[in-house]
Curated annotation (Swiss-Prot):
Lineage of the species this protein comes from: Bacteria, Pseudomonadati, Pseudomonadota, Gammaproteobacteria, Chromatiales
Role played: Allows the formation of correctly charged Asn-tRNA(Asn) or Gln-tRNA(Gln) through the transamidation of misacylated Asp-tRNA(Asn) or Glu-tRNA(Gln) in organisms which lack either or both of asparaginyl-tRNA or glutaminyl-tRNA synthetases. The reaction takes place in the presence of glutamine and ATP through an activated phospho-Asp-tRNA(Asn) or phospho-Glu-tRNA(Gln).
Pfam families: GatB_N (PF02934), GatB_Yqey (PF02637)
SMART domains, A to Z: GatB_Yqey
Subunit structure: Heterotrimer of A, B and C subunits.
Name of protein: Aspartyl/glutamyl-tRNA(Asn/Gln) amidotransferase subunit B
Family according to the record: Belongs to the GatB/GatE family. GatB subfamily.
Organism: Halorhodospira halophila (strain DSM 244 / SL1) (Ectothiorhodospira halophila (strain DSM 244 / SL1))
Recorded superkingdom: Bacteria
Name of the gene encoding the protein in the UniProt record: gatB
């Protein structure tokens, strides 16, 4: 029997506000445990939550970016459950009236085709605290710094049909929230987390199979691996006559397997009811229009523009628009170079990205600025510097040795473009290698590269390669 995979993702994006969703406590990551929780976050008696207006604006911004409906009226609800790091005994969330409904995101498939993934809803909620199991010798410590941190939960339709599609959707959403500057997307710090609902069904069957929810998916790679394992587990179970149980499963990163965590809860298990301490959220058209004015150029729009305006291949445009910082860096560098977009793209993708990856830096932390990269491109274009020399200059700039012109002068890398000087080197290379000359003229054309190498070696790598090729061709073929 052939099986079809059905996947829906629930993404929790931590909103990039300075203070929490219902209190004035800070949201900075990495502080000492329990130093950033106020009485509201701790659920102490006599205090009331006050909604952070910036959280609402961020949700609207996201909704507009995915072409969703912004609800004119949404309501907060209490989601009741017990957990040690949930001090109030309930989580303030949104249930039947979320702030964002509908919407979609287009992803690219492995074959280059595009697929539209529906977004069911996006709602606002507060995060819980964090249970710490290490270093407590059989006990559990609770850190409530994270309690009350604003989250937006983005729920997709069950439109994803493979683990690869799920990873592509997650990456696309990750790029979008960073472009919108509503979430920093730091997965190591838990700012962007994913739960996946997955089931399988016979191909052609309309009814969904029994689903399992997967937790602990904090990287794109883990999402794909966990889903691959779970799909295979469910198919093996069904084909051996067993039944899939609706449950929550945890992905074990070390073993590469999912294991049962608890029976999957239904909505009625949480006894949702409207939050009595918060008024409904009213969003008028004026606020939506105000937020719309702040929308940046979105990733898909920017990628298309890079292809059209700069003449870049689709792959290059995709790499350069992967993050807003990357795209801005590229455009500033192109402007500084005098408009040489393709060479700028090549240097950025080959040299800059390699050095960033090697040193574990974000592009905003690069010691080579857009202006420096643009000037380096300009020196290659005006033939002051060879393409090979550009790599040496980049390495020196990365090491903090100065601007391109300064490095070129200091290291003596200025390219030789004087025709008579290059011609003398060409004549010398031919005269010093009569045997190779005879073989070349006898039809061994691969020796052309040998002569190019001899000239470049004699010039210390400074001779203009194009001129070397032209003069050699003329003299070897014409003499």
């Amino acid at each position: 029997m052939k099986w079809e995979t059905v996947i829906g993702l629930e993404i929790h994006a931590q909103l990039a506000t300075r203070t929490k969703i219902f209190s004035g406590a800070p949201t900075a990551y990495g502080a000492e445990p329990n130093t950033q929780a106020c009485p509201v976050d701790l659920g102490l008696p006599g205090v009331l939550p006050v909604l952070n207006r910036e959280v609402v604006r961020m949700a609207i911004k996201f909704g507009l970016a995915v072409d969703a409906r912004i609800a004119p009226r949404s309501v907060f609800a209490r989601k009741n459950y017990f957990y040690p790091d949930l001090p109030k005994g309930y989580q303030i969330s949104q249930y039947d009236l979320p702030i964002v409904e509908g919407g979609h995101l287009d992803i690219e498939l492995e074959d280059g085709a595009s697929k539209r993934i529906g977004i069911t809803r996006a709602h606002l909620e507060e995060d819980a605290g964090k249970s710490l199991h290490e270093d407590f010798h059989g006990m559990t410590g609770v850190d409530l710094n994270r309690a009350g941190t604003p989250l937006m939960e983005i729920v997709s339709e069950p439109d994803l049909r493979s683990p690869a599609e799920a990873a592509a959707y997650m990456k696309k959403l990750h790029a979008l929230v960073r472009y919108l500057e509503i979430c920093d997307g730091n997965m190591q710090e838990g700012s962007f987390r994913c739960d996946a609902n997955v089931s399988v069904r016979p191909v052609g069957q309309e009814a969904f199979g029994t689903r399992a929810e997967l937790k602990n998916l904090n990287s794109f790679r883990f999402v794909e691996r966990a889903l691959e394992y779970e799909v295979e587990r469910q198919i093996d179970l069904l084909e051996s006559g067993g039944e899939v149980v609706q449950e929550t499963r945890l992905y074990d990163v070390d073993k590469g397997v999912t294991r049962s965590m608890r029976t999957k809860e239904e909505a009625n298990d949480y006894r949702y009811f409207p939050e009595p301490d918060l008024l409904p959220v009213e969003v008028d058209a004026a606020l939506v229009d105000e937020v719309r004015e702040t929308l940046p150029e979105l990733p898909d729009e920017k990628r298309r523009r890079f292809e059209e305006e700069y003449g870049l291949p689709a792959y290059d445009a995709g790499v350069l628009t992967a993050t807003r910082d990357m795209a801005d860096f590229f455009e500033h560098a192109v402007s500084e170079s005098g408009g040489f977009a393709k060479r700028t793209a090549n240097l950025l993708m080959s040299e800059l990205l390699a050095y960033l990856n090697k040193d574990g830096l974000e592009i905003a932390e690069s010691p080579v600025t857009p202006e420096m990269l643009g000037k380096l491109v300009a020196r290659v274009e005006d033939e002051t510097l060879s393409s090979r020399g550009a790599k040496d200059v980049f390495e020196a700039m990365w090491a903090g040795e100065g601007e391109p012109d300064e490095v070129i002068e200091k290291k003596g890398l200025k390219q030789v473009t004087d025709t008579s000087a290059i011609e003398a080197l060409v004549d010398e290379a031919i005269a010093n290698n009569p045997q190779q000359l005879e073989q070349y003229r006898a039809g061994k054309e691969k020796l052309f590269g040998f002569f190019v190498g001899q000239v470049m070696k004699a010039s210390g790598g400074k001779a203009n390669p194009q001129q070397v090729n032209e003069l050699l061709k003329k003299k070897l073929d014409g003499s």
